[in-house]
Design a protein with these regions (language model features):
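Extracytoplasmic ligand-binding site segments that recognize negatively charged/polar headgroups
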Residues: 132-135, 151-164, 197-219
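Bacterial N-terminal signal peptides
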Residues: 18-27
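Bacterial Sec-exported substrate-binding components of ABC uptake systems
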Residues: 2-15, 28-71, 172-203, 260, ...
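A short, structured surface patch at a secondary-structure boundary
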Residues: 65-119, 123-129
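Alpha-helical, coiled-coil/dimerization segments enriched in small aliphatic residues
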Residues: 90-93, 212-241
Length: 327
Protein backbone atom coordinates (compact mmCIF):
# COMPACT_ATOMS: atom_id res chain seq x y z
CA UNK A 1 0.00 0.00 0.00
CA UNK A 2 1.41 3.42 -0.97
CA UNK A 3 0.74 6.06 1.62
CA UNK A 4 -0.23 9.61 0.79
CA UNK A 5 2.85 11.76 1.20
CA UNK A 6 2.57 14.77 3.44
CA UNK A 7 4.82 17.74 2.88
CA UNK A 8 7.49 18.35 5.48
CA UNK A 9 9.24 21.62 4.45
CA UNK A 10 11.50 21.77 7.49
CA UNK A 11 12.66 18.20 7.00
CA UNK A 12 13.30 18.78 3.32
CA UNK A 13 15.39 21.89 4.02
CA UNK A 14 17.43 19.97 6.58
CA UNK A 15 17.93 17.08 4.18
CA UNK A 16 19.08 19.43 1.41
CA UNK A 17 21.61 21.05 3.72
CA UNK A 18 23.27 17.80 4.75
CA UNK A 19 23.19 15.89 1.47
CA UNK A 20 26.18 17.62 -0.06
CA UNK A 21 28.33 17.10 3.02
CA UNK A 22 27.34 13.46 3.30
CA UNK A 23 27.94 12.67 -0.34
CA UNK A 24 31.45 14.14 -0.16
CA UNK A 25 32.38 12.05 2.86
CA UNK A 26 30.83 8.69 2.00
CA UNK A 27 33.62 7.38 -0.20
CA UNK A 28 36.33 8.47 2.20
CA UNK A 29 34.84 6.90 5.32
CA UNK A 30 33.46 3.65 3.92
CA UNK A 31 33.96 0.99 6.60
CA UNK A 32 35.01 -2.58 5.99
CA UNK A 33 32.10 -4.97 5.47
CA UNK A 34 31.66 -7.40 8.35
CA UNK A 35 32.63 -10.98 7.66
CA UNK A 36 29.73 -13.41 7.36
CA UNK A 37 27.92 -15.88 5.17
CA UNK A 38 26.67 -13.06 2.98
CA UNK A 39 30.20 -12.46 1.68
CA UNK A 40 30.00 -15.78 -0.17
CA UNK A 41 26.66 -15.16 -1.90
CA UNK A 42 26.59 -13.47 -5.27
CA UNK A 43 23.09 -13.94 -6.72
CA UNK A 44 20.92 -10.84 -6.74
CA UNK A 45 17.25 -10.81 -5.75
CA UNK A 46 14.62 -8.71 -7.56
CA UNK A 47 11.24 -7.93 -6.03
CA UNK A 48 8.53 -5.27 -5.83
CA UNK A 49 8.48 -3.46 -2.51
CA UNK A 50 5.38 -2.09 -0.80
CA UNK A 51 5.71 1.28 -2.50
CA UNK A 52 5.42 -0.51 -5.84
CA UNK A 53 9.11 0.01 -6.65
CA UNK A 54 11.22 -2.65 -8.32
CA UNK A 55 14.23 -3.36 -6.12
CA UNK A 56 17.19 -5.45 -7.22
CA UNK A 57 19.60 -6.17 -4.39
CA UNK A 58 22.83 -8.09 -4.16
CA UNK A 59 23.25 -10.15 -0.98
CA UNK A 60 23.94 -7.30 1.45
CA UNK A 61 26.95 -7.06 3.71
CA UNK A 62 25.75 -4.00 5.60
CA UNK A 63 22.06 -3.57 6.44
CA UNK A 64 20.21 -0.74 8.19
CA UNK A 65 16.73 -1.28 9.62
CA UNK A 66 14.66 1.87 10.12
CA UNK A 67 12.24 0.16 12.50
CA UNK A 68 13.04 -2.26 15.31
CA UNK A 69 10.76 -5.04 14.10
CA UNK A 70 12.65 -5.11 10.79
CA UNK A 71 15.94 -5.43 12.67
CA UNK A 72 14.41 -8.37 14.53
CA UNK A 73 13.15 -9.93 11.31
CA UNK A 74 16.51 -9.48 9.58
CA UNK A 75 18.17 -11.34 12.45
CA UNK A 76 15.59 -14.13 12.16
CA UNK A 77 16.50 -14.37 8.47
CA UNK A 78 20.12 -15.07 9.41
CA UNK A 79 21.45 -11.55 8.97
CA UNK A 80 22.62 -10.74 12.51
CA UNK A 81 26.24 -10.39 11.44
CA UNK A 82 25.37 -7.88 8.69
CA UNK A 83 23.12 -5.53 10.70
CA UNK A 84 25.06 -2.28 11.11
CA UNK A 85 22.36 0.27 12.04
CA UNK A 86 18.84 0.29 13.48
CA UNK A 87 16.17 2.62 14.83
CA UNK A 88 16.20 3.09 18.59
CA UNK A 89 13.20 0.84 19.21
CA UNK A 90 15.45 -2.10 18.35
CA UNK A 91 16.87 -1.50 21.83
CA UNK A 92 13.91 -0.02 23.71
CA UNK A 93 11.14 -2.33 22.48
CA UNK A 94 12.77 -5.47 21.13
CA UNK A 95 15.82 -6.10 23.33
CA UNK A 96 17.71 -7.70 20.44
CA UNK A 97 21.10 -7.91 22.16
CA UNK A 98 22.69 -6.11 19.23
CA UNK A 99 26.43 -5.85 18.78
CA UNK A 100 27.87 -2.74 20.42
CA UNK A 101 29.00 -1.48 17.01
CA UNK A 102 25.44 -1.30 15.63
CA UNK A 103 24.56 2.37 15.10
CA UNK A 104 21.50 3.86 16.81
CA UNK A 105 19.65 5.85 14.12
CA UNK A 106 17.24 7.57 16.50
CA UNK A 107 13.46 7.45 16.49
CA UNK A 108 11.44 5.63 13.85
CA UNK A 109 9.89 8.94 12.77
CA UNK A 110 13.11 10.94 13.18
CA UNK A 111 15.81 8.88 11.48
CA UNK A 112 19.24 10.51 11.72
CA UNK A 113 20.43 10.73 8.12
CA UNK A 114 23.99 11.63 9.08
CA UNK A 115 24.31 8.48 11.17
CA UNK A 116 22.62 6.38 8.51
CA UNK A 117 24.94 7.58 5.76
CA UNK A 118 28.02 7.13 7.95
CA UNK A 119 27.02 3.50 8.58
CA UNK A 120 27.40 2.89 4.82
CA UNK A 121 24.58 0.33 4.42
CA UNK A 122 24.24 -1.40 1.08
CA UNK A 123 20.58 -2.13 1.89
CA UNK A 124 18.12 -0.10 3.96
CA UNK A 125 14.90 -1.72 5.22
CA UNK A 126 12.25 0.99 5.64
CA UNK A 127 8.58 1.09 6.63
CA UNK A 128 6.01 2.11 4.03
CA UNK A 129 3.53 2.40 6.89
CA UNK A 130 5.50 5.27 8.44
CA UNK A 131 4.92 8.52 6.54
CA UNK A 132 8.14 10.14 7.78
CA UNK A 133 10.16 7.26 6.32
CA UNK A 134 8.36 7.41 2.99
CA UNK A 135 9.21 11.11 2.90
CA UNK A 136 12.90 10.24 3.22
CA UNK A 137 12.96 8.26 -0.03
CA UNK A 138 14.29 11.07 -2.29
CA UNK A 139 17.09 11.82 0.17
CA UNK A 140 18.03 8.16 0.51
CA UNK A 141 18.16 7.77 -3.25
CA UNK A 142 20.21 10.96 -3.62
CA UNK A 143 22.69 9.54 -1.14
CA UNK A 144 22.96 6.48 -3.35
CA UNK A 145 21.49 4.15 -0.73
CA UNK A 146 19.48 1.14 -1.89
CA UNK A 147 16.23 1.07 0.07
CA UNK A 148 13.32 -1.37 0.15
CA UNK A 149 10.00 -0.44 1.77
CA UNK A 150 7.81 -2.98 3.53
CA UNK A 151 4.43 -2.92 5.28
CA UNK A 152 3.96 -5.64 7.88
CA UNK A 153 0.49 -5.42 9.43
CA UNK A 154 -0.58 -9.06 9.19
CA UNK A 155 0.98 -12.50 9.22
CA UNK A 156 1.10 -12.87 5.42
CA UNK A 157 3.06 -9.61 5.21
CA UNK A 158 5.56 -11.06 7.68
CA UNK A 159 5.89 -14.28 5.66
CA UNK A 160 6.48 -12.30 2.47
CA UNK A 161 9.21 -10.13 3.99
CA UNK A 162 10.88 -13.06 5.76
CA UNK A 163 10.92 -15.01 2.49
CA UNK A 164 12.67 -12.15 0.69
CA UNK A 165 15.13 -11.59 3.52
CA UNK A 166 16.11 -15.26 3.69
CA UNK A 167 16.67 -15.19 -0.06
CA UNK A 168 19.03 -12.27 0.49
CA UNK A 169 20.89 -13.94 3.35
CA UNK A 170 20.87 -17.31 1.62
CA UNK A 171 19.65 -18.96 4.82
CA UNK A 172 16.43 -20.52 3.52
CA UNK A 173 16.30 -22.95 6.45
CA UNK A 174 15.36 -19.91 8.53
CA UNK A 175 12.23 -19.46 6.42
CA UNK A 176 11.25 -23.06 7.10
CA UNK A 177 11.76 -22.52 10.83
CA UNK A 178 10.46 -19.00 11.42
CA UNK A 179 8.06 -18.86 8.49
CA UNK A 180 6.48 -22.18 7.60
CA UNK A 181 6.80 -23.55 11.12
CA UNK A 182 5.04 -20.52 12.57
CA UNK A 183 2.43 -20.69 9.80
CA UNK A 184 1.38 -24.12 11.05
CA UNK A 185 0.76 -22.64 14.50
CA UNK A 186 -1.23 -19.78 12.99
CA UNK A 187 -3.37 -22.13 10.90
CA UNK A 188 -4.11 -24.30 13.93
CA UNK A 189 -5.43 -21.19 15.70
CA UNK A 190 -7.51 -20.21 12.65
CA UNK A 191 -9.04 -23.67 12.58
CA UNK A 192 -10.48 -23.11 16.05
CA UNK A 193 -12.84 -20.37 14.80
CA UNK A 194 -16.32 -21.86 15.11
CA UNK A 195 -18.26 -19.53 12.83
CA UNK A 196 -19.99 -17.69 15.67
CA UNK A 197 -18.49 -14.37 14.49
CA UNK A 198 -18.18 -12.66 17.89
CA UNK A 199 -18.18 -8.87 17.86
CA UNK A 200 -15.17 -7.01 19.18
CA UNK A 201 -14.01 -3.52 20.10
CA UNK A 202 -10.29 -2.73 19.78
CA UNK A 203 -8.94 0.34 21.60
CA UNK A 204 -5.37 1.60 21.40
CA UNK A 205 -4.43 3.73 24.40
CA UNK A 206 -1.49 6.14 24.60
CA UNK A 207 -0.55 8.93 26.94
CA UNK A 208 -2.21 11.32 24.50
CA UNK A 209 -5.58 9.56 24.50
CA UNK A 210 -7.52 6.57 23.21
CA UNK A 211 -8.50 5.59 19.69
CA UNK A 212 -10.72 2.87 18.30
CA UNK A 213 -9.03 0.76 15.61
CA UNK A 214 -10.71 -1.21 12.85
CA UNK A 215 -9.46 -4.36 11.11
CA UNK A 216 -7.11 -2.65 8.68
CA UNK A 217 -3.38 -2.02 8.99
CA UNK A 218 -2.94 -2.95 12.64
CA UNK A 219 -1.61 -6.20 14.06
CA UNK A 220 -4.45 -6.95 16.48
CA UNK A 221 -7.13 -5.65 14.11
CA UNK A 222 -5.98 -7.90 11.27
CA UNK A 223 -5.61 -10.85 13.64
CA UNK A 224 -9.14 -10.49 15.03
CA UNK A 225 -10.56 -10.48 11.51
CA UNK A 226 -8.46 -13.50 10.56
CA UNK A 227 -9.92 -15.39 13.54
CA UNK A 228 -13.50 -14.68 12.49
CA UNK A 229 -14.31 -11.65 14.65
CA UNK A 230 -16.51 -8.77 13.56
CA UNK A 231 -14.86 -5.48 14.53
CA UNK A 232 -17.63 -3.00 15.34
CA UNK A 233 -15.55 -0.16 13.88
CA UNK A 234 -15.57 -1.82 10.46
CA UNK A 235 -19.26 -1.09 10.03
CA UNK A 236 -19.32 2.18 11.99
CA UNK A 237 -16.28 4.21 11.04
CA UNK A 238 -17.50 7.23 13.00
CA UNK A 239 -15.89 5.47 15.97
CA UNK A 240 -12.52 5.93 14.29
CA UNK A 241 -13.01 9.67 14.10
CA UNK A 242 -14.40 10.21 17.59
CA UNK A 243 -14.43 7.69 20.41
CA UNK A 244 -18.05 7.60 21.59
CA UNK A 245 -18.96 5.65 24.71
CA UNK A 246 -22.62 6.14 23.83
CA UNK A 247 -22.12 4.38 20.50
CA UNK A 248 -20.08 1.60 22.14
CA UNK A 249 -22.92 1.06 24.60
CA UNK A 250 -25.39 0.79 21.73
CA UNK A 251 -23.27 -1.76 19.84
CA UNK A 252 -22.35 -3.64 23.07
CA UNK A 253 -19.53 -5.83 21.67
CA UNK A 254 -18.94 -9.38 22.89
CA UNK A 255 -15.24 -8.68 23.53
CA UNK A 256 -13.20 -5.58 24.32
CA UNK A 257 -9.47 -5.54 23.65
CA UNK A 258 -7.07 -2.78 24.72
CA UNK A 259 -3.42 -2.30 23.80
CA UNK A 260 -1.32 0.16 25.80
CA UNK A 261 1.20 1.93 23.59
CA UNK A 262 4.28 3.86 24.66
CA UNK A 263 7.31 3.45 26.91
CA UNK A 264 5.37 4.47 30.03
CA UNK A 265 2.22 2.35 30.12
CA UNK A 266 0.98 4.20 33.21
CA UNK A 267 0.32 7.27 31.07
CA UNK A 268 -1.78 5.20 28.68
CA UNK A 269 -3.64 3.70 31.64
CA UNK A 270 -4.46 7.15 32.99
CA UNK A 271 -5.79 8.22 29.59
CA UNK A 272 -7.91 5.07 29.38
CA UNK A 273 -9.27 5.57 32.89
CA UNK A 274 -10.14 9.20 32.21
CA UNK A 275 -11.68 8.56 28.79
CA UNK A 276 -13.69 5.39 29.44
CA UNK A 277 -13.16 3.31 32.55
CA UNK A 278 -14.08 6.00 35.09
CA UNK A 279 -17.50 6.45 33.49
CA UNK A 280 -20.09 4.38 35.43
CA UNK A 281 -21.77 3.47 32.14
CA UNK A 282 -18.68 1.51 31.14
CA UNK A 283 -19.51 -1.10 33.76
CA UNK A 284 -22.84 -1.81 32.07
CA UNK A 285 -21.19 -3.26 28.96
CA UNK A 286 -21.76 -6.99 28.55
CA UNK A 287 -18.07 -7.66 27.87
CA UNK A 288 -17.08 -5.92 31.11
CA UNK A 289 -19.73 -7.63 33.21
CA UNK A 290 -18.88 -11.08 31.84
CA UNK A 291 -15.10 -10.74 32.11
CA UNK A 292 -14.39 -10.37 28.41
CA UNK A 293 -12.36 -7.17 28.70
CA UNK A 294 -8.68 -7.85 27.94
CA UNK A 295 -5.51 -5.75 28.03
CA UNK A 296 -3.24 -7.31 25.42
CA UNK A 297 0.55 -7.56 25.28
CA UNK A 298 1.91 -4.60 23.32
CA UNK A 299 4.84 -6.68 22.05
CA UNK A 300 2.55 -9.29 20.49
CA UNK A 301 -0.44 -7.22 19.38
CA UNK A 302 0.90 -3.77 18.50
CA UNK A 303 4.55 -4.20 17.66
CA UNK A 304 5.28 -6.99 15.21
CA UNK A 305 5.32 -10.46 16.82
CA UNK A 306 7.65 -11.87 14.13
CA UNK A 307 8.75 -15.33 15.37
CA UNK A 308 5.93 -15.17 17.95
CA UNK A 309 3.02 -14.80 15.51
CA UNK A 310 1.92 -18.34 16.29
CA UNK A 311 1.97 -17.66 20.02
CA UNK A 312 -0.05 -14.47 19.50
CA UNK A 313 -2.69 -16.27 17.43
CA UNK A 314 -2.94 -19.15 19.90
CA UNK A 315 -3.47 -16.84 22.87
CA UNK A 316 -6.15 -14.86 21.02
CA UNK A 317 -7.91 -18.08 19.95
CA UNK A 318 -7.87 -19.19 23.61
CA UNK A 319 -9.80 -16.02 24.47
CA UNK A 320 -12.25 -16.10 21.58
CA UNK A 321 -12.95 -19.83 21.37
CA UNK A 322 -12.08 -21.39 24.74
CA UNK A 323 -14.25 -24.43 24.09
CA UNK A 324 -12.78 -25.22 20.68
CA UNK A 325 -9.73 -27.01 22.13
CA UNK A 326 -6.24 -27.08 20.76
CA UNK A 327 -5.74 -28.24 17.18
Amino acid sequence: MILERNEYPAVKRRIFCILTILCLTLAACAPTAPAGNGSERTQSVSFTDDLGRTVTAEPPRRVAALIGSFADLWQLAGGADTLVAAADDAWTSFDLNLDEDVVDLGGVKQINLEQLAAAQPDLVLASSNTAAQVELLPALEQLGLKVAYFKVAEFQDYLHMLDLCTQLTGDTDRFAQYGLGVERQVQAARDRADGSAPTALYIRATGAGCKVKNSRDSVLGEMLRDLGCVNIADSDETLLEQLSLERILQLDPDFIFVVMQGADKSEAQRALDHTLLANPAWQSLTAVQQGRYYVMDDRLYNLKPNARWGEAYEHLADILYPDAGQA
